[in-house]
């Protein structure tokens, strides 16, 4: 058995789940990207680093980096072309400590960031409120639709149940 080298990751994605609009989650296939695969895409495609530099930054060989990058790109292309959801999770990586997490204060709408390895803030640095939430990470962004998890048949049956209970009143 070959020991897989843990990749160094310096940034976590702000959101970990993407899906096509108006298709219930239960009706979708999911493409799974690991944290290190998304890091390879970030370094090469977003930051436009050369392959050598990106591989060095992740602590792996150029060949390994290229394999990770190609695998990640193939998964993203498959999801986009074939209407699949994309989930980003798991993998074998080491956090380099450069990762930052964003927080939101529900009281004053102030957004700030903290290093990943720091303890969670207890209050907003702007207004002192303790109504703070971590942004990203759970896949539920501002446009999250709560009822999007059920299939169309379930929606219809729940609607008819609701309508039936309204008529009885």
Curated annotation (Swiss-Prot):
Gene3D superfamilies: Winged helix-like DNA-binding domain superfamily/Winged helix DNA-binding domain
InterPro entries: RNA_pol_sigma_r3/r4-like, UPF0251, WH-like_DNA-bd_sf
Coiled-coil segments on the chain, per record: none
One protein family per Pfam: DUF134
HAMAP family on file: UPF0251
Family: Belongs to the UPF0251 family.
Protein's UniProt name: UPF0251 protein MM_2090
